[in-house]
A protein has these predicted regions:
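FIC/Doc superfamily catalytic core
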Residues: 1-127
């Protein structure tokens, strides 16, 4: 079973990633980003594996600009947290993570399967 973030989780992640004075521009966009990994089509998960769900969350947060400032930081930290609460950890250098999030945010990398493949490549489980 997959565990998901909720709005309170996301706001706390934003405060940690961006700073205590997070300014939300559009709560609806935050809610939409949170709902996307849970989406289903005709009773089937739209994003059938954990890394596709994480990719959908990252993509929505990075592209939709729900915050006044800090959308990319929120997107990455929320994605990493989502994977962590589902017992998957990320191992990638700061430069790799930066380039990856910039590529997603600018649309240079927009295919969810490609985003998920990168996350999967960096992902590991302990034990």
């Amino acid at each position: 079973m997959t565990d998901y973030l909720d709005l309170e989780d996301l706001l706390e992640i934003a405060r940690e990633a961006v700073g205590r004075d997070v300014m939300v521009r559009d709560y609806g966009l935050l809610e939409s980003a949170l709902a996307r990994p849970r989406a289903s089509v005709f009773g089937q998960d739209a994003y059938p594996d954990l890394h596709l769900k994480a990719a959908a969350l990252l993509h929505s947060l990075a592209r939709n600009h729900a915050l006044v400032d800090g959308n990319k930081r929120l997107a990455w930290t929320a994605c990493r947290t989502f994977l962590a609460i589902n017992a998957h950890w990320i191992s990638a250098s700061e430069d790799e993570r930066f380039d990856f999030v910039i590529a997603v945010a600018t649309g240079a990398m927009s295919d969810l399967h490609e985003i998920a493949a990168q996350l999967r490549g960096w992902s590991y489980q302990e034990g």
